Amino acid sequence: MNELDLHGLRHDDAVDKAEDFVLMESHNSMFECRIIVGNSSTMTNKVTNMLDGHGFRYYIPSWNVGEIIVSN
């Protein structure tokens, strides 16, 4: 599973980078990828809002709330 780590990025830059990453990954019809957002509820909310806007399915694992698993 491919992953993107957003640590150290400003929120707006991180969302742009996550959007580009997920859109590229989604060209594969059966994709799943991981976005590492860290321990920031603001970052998580911004990234999940972007994912919702594109209609992607995702979940945040209970064992690691610092990541988002995305699929189509």
Predicted features, each with a name:
Residues 1-72:
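N-terminal targeting/trafficking signals and adjacent low-complexity tails
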